[in-house]
């Protein structure tokens, strides 16, 4: 198996046959020099919780783009994000940012998520059909993030386009020269945008997310300006296409299992379980990477120091050793803990908000558009992102009669 398999068109359309092969081959499969991959749930879970597995972000940039690239403002910004750093810096920074994503803070966003869903549906409800990605799934999470930051909603489209360009930094394959230029330009634009906003919040603080960052303290230390800019951009990246793609993935999964869709529509109180099961069945985030900071032995297998391990979350979520009938969508499933948000110290900080957004988006869609039906279920246009699975378009008939 090779790393390039992750960019194969067949994999991008349906990664799960390759995942089945991966789990069956060996505990770990070599995919290159000092690089391993595993899709077994037990190994993924164990390594995510292992404190000797960490991040080597700048080293990975040098490996993919050369030594001088590590000094580029774009990559330096990513090196300040708490998703790319290790303790103790990670512990301090995550503790500060976490104050904005407690259970209480996340739950307080539910009315906003519901209102945003209704407002978007108002714009297209009377149409016979619509591209749900463009008209609902993409603007939905970005508008919520903008409102959380007290950013002009009119800027949401521009911010979303910039974030999509920057997010390619997180793909395992190097960007092309043109993509790198576009990503760098997009970062500079976002950095300037949020620098102005941060300075405004310093003199006129509010109850928004950026003001919370400025007020947040842990052991008397506040975030620096560069840390705030980097991590505000990180929150845009983490909370945008991961959620927007998952809305589409969930609708596709449910429509491919009509009995589950009918069950959910008959009892929308099942929505939290349905969202969790859709995340397990076909999550938008398919893998994460960790580096061995020391020699590690796990389940009798040695992972040498310096080895980069691709932890295939999508494969772990379909592991029959963890889930009964894993290739079946079952919205009443109570067995097993999904790996879609990772685990350990780098567990997704915004997972509660993501779950709330997905629950509100799907519930509101089914309440307002009970006859919604996907128009081209067998001819979907999957994106070309190995680690951000989703469709580019999703045409739906809004008032289809069965």
UniProtKB/Swiss-Prot annotation:
<dbReference type="GO" id="GO:0020037">
    <property type="term" value="F:heme binding"/>
</dbReference>
<dbReference type="GO" id="GO:0016705">
    <property type="term" value="F:oxidoreductase activity, acting on paired donors, with incorporation or reduction of molecular oxygen"/>
</dbReference>
<dbReference type="InterPro" id="IPR001128">
    <property type="entry name" value="Cyt_P450"/>
</dbReference>
<dbReference type="GO" id="GO:0005506">
    <property type="term" value="F:iron ion binding"/>
</dbReference>
<dbReference type="InterPro" id="IPR017972">
    <property type="entry name" value="Cyt_P450_CS"/>
</dbReference>
<dbReference type="InterPro" id="IPR002397">
    <property type="entry name" value="Cyt_P450_B"/>
</dbReference>
<protein>
    <recommendedName>
        <fullName>Putative cytochrome P450 133B1</fullName>
        <ecNumber>1.14.-.-</ecNumber>
    </recommendedName>
</protein>
<keyword id="KW-0479">Metal-binding</keyword>
<keyword id="KW-0503">Monooxygenase</keyword>
<comment type="similarity">
    <text>Belongs to the cytochrome P450 family.</text>
</comment>
<dbReference type="GO" id="GO:0004497">
    <property type="term" value="F:monooxygenase activity"/>
</dbReference>
<keyword id="KW-0560">Oxidoreductase</keyword>
<dbReference type="InterPro" id="IPR036396">
    <property type="entry name" value="Cyt_P450_sf"/>
</dbReference>
<keyword id="KW-0349">Heme</keyword>
<feature type="binding site" description="axial binding residue">
    <location>
        <position position="348"/>
    </location>
    <ligand>
        <name>heme</name>
    </ligand>
</feature>
<dbReference type="Pfam" id="PF00067">
    <property type="entry name" value="p450"/>
</dbReference>
<keyword id="KW-0408">Iron</keyword>
């Amino acid at each position: 198996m090779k790393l390039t398999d992750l960019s194969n068109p067949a994999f991008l359309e349906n990664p799960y046959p390759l995942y089945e092969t991966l789990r069956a081959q060996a505990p770990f499969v070599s995919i290159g020099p000092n690089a391993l991959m595993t899709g077994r749930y037990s190994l993924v879970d164990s390594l995510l919780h292992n404190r000797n597995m960490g991040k080597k972000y700048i080293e990975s940039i040098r490996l993919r783009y050369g030594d001088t690239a590590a000094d580029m403002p774009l990559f330096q910004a990513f090196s300040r994000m708490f998703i790319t750093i290790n303790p103790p810096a990670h512990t301090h920074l995550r503790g500060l940012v976490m104050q904005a994503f407690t259970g209480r803070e996340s739950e307080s966003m539910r009315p906003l998520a519901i209102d945003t869903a209704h407002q978007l549906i108002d714009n297209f409800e009377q149409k016979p059909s619509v591209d749900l990605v463009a008209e609902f799934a993409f603007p939905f999470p970005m508008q919520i993030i903008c409102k959380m930051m007290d950013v002009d909603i009119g800027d949401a489209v521009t911010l979303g386009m910039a974030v999509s360009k920057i997010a390619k930094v997180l793909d395992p394959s190097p960007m092309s020269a043109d993509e790198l230029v576009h990503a760098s330009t997009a970062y500079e634009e976002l950095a300037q945008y949020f620098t102005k906003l941060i300075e405004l919040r310093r003199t006129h603080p509010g109850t928004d997310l950026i003001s919370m960052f400025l007020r947040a303290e842990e052991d008397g230390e506040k975030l620096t300006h560069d840390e705030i800019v980097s991590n505000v951009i990180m929150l845009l990246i983490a909370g945008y296409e991961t959620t927007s793609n998952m809305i589409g993935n969930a609708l596709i999964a449910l429509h491919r299992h009509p009995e589950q869709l009918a069950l959910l529509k008959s009892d929308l109180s099942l929505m939290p379980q349905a969202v969790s099961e859709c995340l397990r069945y076909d999550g938008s985030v398919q893998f994460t990477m960790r580096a061995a900071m020391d020699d590690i032995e796990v389940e009798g297998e040695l992972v040498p120091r310096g080895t980069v391990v691709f932890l295939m979350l999508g494969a772990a979520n379909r592991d029959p050793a963890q889930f009964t009938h894993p290739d079946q969508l079952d919205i009443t499933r109570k067995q097993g803990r999904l790996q879609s948000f990772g685990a350990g110290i780098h567990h997704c900080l915004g997972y509660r908000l993501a779950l709330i957004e997905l629950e509100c988006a799907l519930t509101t869609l089914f309440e307002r558009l009970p006859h919604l039906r996907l128009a081209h279920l067998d001819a979907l246009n999957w994106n070309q992102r190995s680690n951000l699975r989703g469709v580019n378009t999703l045409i739906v008939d809004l008032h289809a009669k069965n």
